[in-house]
């Protein structure tokens, strides 16, 4: 009770008065030997407290004279079953016997018009206003309505305007910008933030191709540990609200993929045209998987994206492939008439007869053309070679397989290479499917020839090849030529590769082949570094039969490439460089050629041509020169290679492994192979329930 009384007095009296009351009450309680309950029953404590309060009030000069009033049930012990000693709050009564409660009221500052000279107006209620700077719109508390504080804000935050008069700030205040009502700031709730964070983490899980369980088992604990160490345990507990369970991540990934698909469909509906690239393969569970990529113009660039990833339930025939693609197009109301080209690998299920996919697509899209992957043409062309070189290649593969097929032999070879200080410790496995690695395989075999000579058992029938200089000369040449061919092949891969890019690379290769053949005829082998270094090492020359075989191979390779990549009179060369055109191309009508003349006469367009890629250059001219630019984009849309499908199947195999055979990989492929970033804010706004725990 004493503490309760002192608390009430602290609102109305200074510290000295409170200390005086406390000392007198303490002395009274210590001098009386009776229990506290008895004092309350007798009323002694009540009388003593009243006496102290009368004395305090009389000594103070406050106009509010009060007497301590308390009802019997407040100061006397209750006779009911309630706990004894329970006291209600103490009230002061004024001299007119009206109940009043003494409390400190906060001081409210008023706004004065002179404060505008410091650049401040008022904001909110006129009786209790806040100070608002007319320059930076910052709102200060009511306590800041003091000239010194307002002047300090002006001099520190807006020193350039500290010498301005009040008319300047009045003009700034009356501007339309300042008359706009302040936009309320929308603050996300914890559930909204946790949901958005869950979508962000799920997006990165899908991009990495990891299992869904990694969110709850690894990412979430690591995030909590980092936040706890860097900030505080209180903040780390908020991470518990981010749901990353297996089922939650799976749902999030499906939502993200659906948002990307929705955006892609909207783009295809408004584009002028698109081209397709499709391929089919089997996954780890034995399902036939169809990948279809699309190339289209969007804004001022040509984009490439995954159109669909579907599992074929029965036979992977051309009809079923077409039905799968056609169902997607009809479901999303995408017009087949916009399809300008279909690129395939020319397999039996993809191209050929009317029952197959490409022919059926051309039937529903009469303006569409079909093309064969140019990389496969190149791969077919390089397989042809003279018998002497073919035998060396086959024997080299047999030597490699003799080592790689026996793990024990591979381990022993590694130990030997380490002891001999070799640069490499293992051979590379050669496969017919991975024809791009053939150059690296042969180079590695040639570099480890000394170690293999020591390692090889004399009983192995091909061990003598490593001591035959003629055999090694042919091997060195094959290592060089396949390395060069692989470099050309890799340069034709990647995104936004056009037919012009591929034919430019092939034209360069054809000229190089003729140059290499002429150099070999003159016994100049500088074009082949491995062969040239080996000749210097053994201090020897190349026999005429070897030179003849090399020249025959180079010339035969050139003629085969000409067969697969014939030189034609292309009427679309104006697309490659419109500024070199002096005569009307046959593929253009008079109106388009006039537009081309206007385009090539524009100096700004000429500058953009040197700065932008070919795809971006023509896409950027759609608004200014729509007719000729659309014709150029239509020429650039067709795919030249199957690079996207090959890359897509590699990602698919890495995502759907033997440990995740039941996984629906389509949403993961949509996220991983798409250039479109999902709009997570839009996805969360569609959710009626912001936070789902499982």
From Swiss-Prot:
PROSITE patterns named among the record's database cross-references: ZF_BED
Record Pfam families: zf-BED
Additional notes on this entry: May be derived from an ancient transposon that has lost its ability to translocate.
Residue stretches in coiled coil: none
Keywords for the protein's UniProt record, in alphabetical order: Metal-binding, Zinc, Zinc-finger
Top-level taxon in the UniProt lineage: Eukaryota
InterPro entries linked: RNaseH-like_sf (IPR012337), Znf_BED (IPR003656)
Name the record gives this protein: Zinc finger BED domain-containing protein 5
MF GO annotations: DNA binding; zinc ion binding
Zinc finger extent (BED-type): 109-165
UniProt binding sites for Zn(2+): 133, 136, 153, 158
